[in-house]
UniProtKB/Swiss-Prot annotation:
It comes from Ralstonia nicotianae (strain ATCC BAA-1114 / GMI1000). One of two assembly initiator proteins, it binds directly to the 5'-end of the 23S rRNA, where it nucleates assembly of the 50S subunit. PANTHER family: MITOCHONDRIAL RIBOSOMAL PROTEIN L24 (PTHR12903). It comes from the Bacteria. The gene is rplX. This is Large ribosomal subunit protein uL24. Belongs to the universal ribosomal protein uL24 family. GO terms for biological process: translation. InterPro entries: KOW (IPR005824), Rib_uL2_dom2 (IPR014722), Ribosomal_uL24 (IPR003256), Ribosomal_uL24_KOW (IPR041988), Translation_prot_SH3-like_sf (IPR008991).
Length: 102
């Protein structure tokens, strides 16, 4: 069971975007892409076959999953634990003890 999933609200703990919050767009193995975090400029060549124009495009790049933490209701970073009740695993915030997601 992954501790961080698509749609979770996270905060960046280290790096150039430290302190920024965003929503997880995708989980790619040990990397995640977070909305508005680690944005790079990519040069795109025009492709008349696809009807795309060339230019400089902002692209969200992945960051390592260890550099982000879930945000609790108070806006503080929190670690995630897994609790088993009646054979069902649920993710739980360590700071508040509240269940994460549905």
């Amino acid at each position: 069971m992954n501790k961080i999933r698509k749609g979770d609200r996270v905060i960046v703990r280290t790096g150039k975007d430290k302190g920024k919050q965003g929503t997880v767009l995708a989980v790619l193995g040990e990397h995640v892409t977070v909305e508005g975090v680690n944005v790079a400029k990519k040069h795109v060549r025009p492709n008349p076959m696809l009807g795309t124009t060339g230019g400089v495009v902002d692209k969200v790049m992945p960051i390592h999953i260890s550099n982000v933490a879930l945000v609790d209701a108070n806006g503080k970073p929190s670690r995630v634990g897994i609790k088993v009740e009646n054979g069902v695993k649920t993710r739980v915030l360590k700071t508040t003890g509240a269940a994460v997601g549905a």
